[in-house]
């Protein structure tokens, strides 16, 4: 995909359908319960109606896509482990043995692991959307070329649209890639104009010394590459990862296809931020599942204007937080589609008092 082709696709993302949102709101108000009594469970279905264009919601087929990629910046000691762990987890994703696979089974959710750019040979059972065998070390120069960033975004768009064509009506996002909290912190710091120290956490449990190395690597990467905060693709290319760029595309693809996309934690939240910076109308497809324990996660969600369903200190990755929210969607849909109405119960409806 070329940048011109990407821009043409983005131009096709339309605003949310406010008539469908209003219809969903009216349906909630007709049900025999206190007005707005289910809080965010109600508004998220209204948002889903605005995205899909219909107050008749069917989200029964769902999938979590786990985008795997390696990051050259791990050479700077920003993580406890090396790139071999990315591959090991990808292999276990293919065998359906990881944490998210167990949670997905409980949530009746399919799992699609995707190689966006892991080091080494392809992993059997992992779908290949590979851009390259990992990114470069961004302390020495750009993590990837601009063309590669566009290609990765394009792969994510194509993936989401294909899943929609296959009948999936809810897409959860996940990722796996050693070093990707470093790339996410770097991208978020530049896009939001925030201090690197504020946007950088301990990832998978770094020591104080490890955290200092991580902050230093990000600062050096920004100094070396001078990314333009007004040019999202420039920031992605210079400081991001193939997983972030691919997830950015998944959010854009969801907006094009009218399919809700669940942001998992910090990393997919940064990807959603990139998507919305590329096309503000794409925000209609972004649904926050939880607020990660990563320090900057809340800042990213606030920038997106999204409130999480769950705040439970999760910071595992793989899409576990997104999948954990799916049963809440199921319960909301059960009430939305099955609860009796005021009219059916012979009860006078509530009326707004304020």
Regions found by a protein language model. Name each.
Residues 1-354:
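N-terminal loops that bind phosphate or other acidic moieties
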């Amino acid at each position: 995909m070329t940048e011109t082709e990407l821009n043409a696709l983005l131009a096709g993302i339309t605003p949310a359908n406010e008539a469908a949102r209003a219809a969903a709101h009216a349906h909630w108000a007709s049900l025999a319960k206190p007005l707005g009594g289910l809080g965010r469970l109600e508004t998220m279905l209204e948002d889903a109606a605005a995205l899909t264009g219909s107050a008749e919601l069917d989200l029964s087929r769902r999938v979590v896509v786990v985008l795997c990629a390696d990051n050259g910046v791990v050479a700077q000691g920003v993580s406890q482990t090396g790139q071999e762990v990315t591959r090991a987890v990808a292999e276990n994703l293919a065998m359906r043995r990881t944490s998210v696979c167990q949670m997905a089974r409980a949530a009746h959710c399919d799992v699609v692991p995707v190689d966006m750019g892991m080091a080494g040979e392809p992993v059997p059972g992992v779908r290949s959307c590979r851009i390259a065998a990992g990114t470069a070390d961004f302390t020495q120069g750009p993590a990837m070329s601009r063309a590669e960033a566009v290609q990765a975004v394009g792969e994510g768009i194509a993936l989401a649209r294909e899943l929609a064509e296959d009948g999936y009506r809810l897409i959860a996002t996940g990722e796996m890639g050693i070093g990707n909290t470093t790339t996410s912190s770097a991208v978020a710091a530049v896009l939001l104009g925030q201090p690197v120290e504020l946007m950088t956490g301990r990832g998978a449990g770094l020591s104080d010394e490890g955290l200092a190395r991580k902050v230093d690597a990000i600062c050096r990467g920004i100094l070396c590459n001078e990314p333009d905060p007004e040019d999202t693709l420039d920031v992605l290319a210079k400081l991001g990862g193939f997983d972030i760029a691919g997830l950015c595309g998944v959010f854009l693809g969801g907006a094009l296809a009218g399919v809700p996309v669940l942001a998992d934690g910090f990393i997919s939240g940064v990807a959603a931020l990139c998507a919305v910076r590329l096309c503000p109308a794409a925000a209609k497809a972004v649904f926050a599942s939880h607020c990660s324990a990563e320090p900057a996660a809340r800042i990213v969600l606030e920038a997106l204007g999204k409130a999480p369903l769950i705040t439970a200190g999760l910071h595992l990755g793989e899409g576990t937080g997104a999948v954990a929210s799916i049963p809440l969607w199921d319960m909301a849909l059960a009430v939305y589609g099955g609860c009796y109405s005021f009219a059916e119960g012979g009860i006078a409806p509530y009326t707004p008092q304020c």
